[in-house]
Amino acid sequence: MPELPEIETIKRGLTSLIINQKVNKAILHRENLRWVIPKHLSTTLTNQLISTIDRRGKYLLIKFKVGTLIIHLGMSGSIKVVNTNTPLLKHEHFELQLKNGTSMRLKDPRRFGAVLFSKDGSHKLLDSLGVEPLKTSFYDGYLYQKSRNKQQNIKAFIMDNKIVVGVGNIYACESLFMAGINPKLKAGSISKTRYNVLTQCIKNILTQAIEAGGTTLQDFVQVNGNPGYFTQNLSVYGCKNKKCYRCKGIIIKFVQNQRSTFYCKKCQT
């Protein structure tokens, strides 16, 4: 699933390609993804200028004077910018054709994504989101404060989008490894000092992933079609039975909260 680094990568790519461009027409090649795509987009967005492109958690926000297009890539979605005359590919379900002769196309094979619209930029899906991990609201002490009396494991805790957004499974595994924290520990049992270390590790891992263009395991590609290169920097995720580069111990894989967890039993205590 595309997480914060992947959406940030797409946001930056789109900003350089489609900002200040006018929409020729919005085309719904399918009526729905996870939810129904608003039919009025085909008329509402015609001749509208793309003013800014933002990100909130895993949501891409494309802003116009008349409102905000809210896009979520679901489990397998991707966005590309191509020449408008490029043949439509299978699973490309939504398209913004621009007056400069290019098109922004959303591909979503599993159809767990979403294309929504808000006149004022607000939406119930955005209202419950936690803090952004790369902003000052994610400060030393924040995770410690939120974790008091929490019985859930630390990995599930930092993946909770109501606490902090965008720390997906890959980045949770990598951050906990860098911080030397066992993913099985209860969130409420970890000291403030260790949480402060983890906070910095989350920031560092996400920043590195963004600089590498995200992580491609299966479906994710950047807007230019290139894969994300953070895959080459993974220390534990996908490294079952390989040697830990720090201690030469063996990386372990187990299922935790219905997700694969990778960690070094020796390094992470």
Curated annotation (Swiss-Prot):
GO biological process, one term: base-excision repair
Cofactor note: Binds 1 zinc ion per subunit.
EC assignment: 3.2.2.23, 4.2.99.18
Annotated GO MF terms: 8-oxo-7,8-dihydroguanine DNA N-glycosylase activity; class I DNA-(apurinic or apyrimidinic site) endonuclease activity; damaged DNA binding; zinc ion binding
InterPro entries hit by this protein: DNA_glyclase/AP_lyase_DNA-bd (IPR015886), DNA_glyclase_Znf_dom_DNA_BS (IPR015887), Formamido-pyr_DNA_Glyclase (IPR020629), FPG_cat (IPR012319), MutM-like_N-ter (IPR035937), Ribosomal_uS13-like_H2TH (IPR010979), Znf_DNA_glyclase/AP_lyase (IPR000214), Znf_FPG/IleRS (IPR010663)
Reaction(s) this enzyme catalyzes, per UniProt: Hydrolysis of DNA containing ring-opened 7-methylguanine residues, releasing 2,6-diamino-4-hydroxy-5-(N-methyl)formamidopyrimidine; 2'-deoxyribonucleotide-(2'-deoxyribose 5'-phosphate)-2'-deoxyribonucleotide-DNA = a 3'-end 2'-deoxyribonucleotide-(2,3-dehydro-2,3-deoxyribose 5'-phosphate)-DNA + a 5'-end 5'-phospho-2'-deoxyribonucleoside-DNA + H(+)
CDD domains, sorted: EcFpg-like_N (cd08966)
Cross-referenced HAMAP family: Fapy_DNA_glycosyl
Binding of DNA, residues: H91, R110, K150
Family (UniProt): Belongs to the FPG family.
Physiological role: Involved in base excision repair of DNA damaged by oxidation or by mutagenic agents. Acts as a DNA glycosylase that recognizes and removes damaged bases. Has a preference for oxidized purines, such as 7,8-dihydro-8-oxoguanine (8-oxoG). Has AP (apurinic/apyrimidinic) lyase activity and introduces nicks in the DNA strand. Cleaves the DNA backbone by beta-delta elimination to generate a single-strand break at the site of the removed base with both 3'- and 5'-phosphates.
Quaternary context: Monomer.
Coiled-coil zones: none
This protein's name: Formamidopyrimidine-DNA glycosylase
PROSITE patterns reported in the protein's UniProt record: FPG_CAT, ZF_FPG_1, ZF_FPG_2
Annotated signal sequence range: none
Source organism (scientific name): Vesicomyosocius okutanii subsp. Calyptogena okutanii (strain HA)
Lineage: superkingdom: Bacteria
Zinc finger (FPG-type) boundaries: 235-269
Reported cofactor(s): Zn(2+)
Catalytic residues identified in the record: P2, E3, K58, R259
Alphabetized UniProt keyword annotations: DNA damage, DNA repair, DNA-binding, Glycosidase, Hydrolase, Lyase, Metal-binding, Multifunctional enzyme, Zinc, Zinc-finger
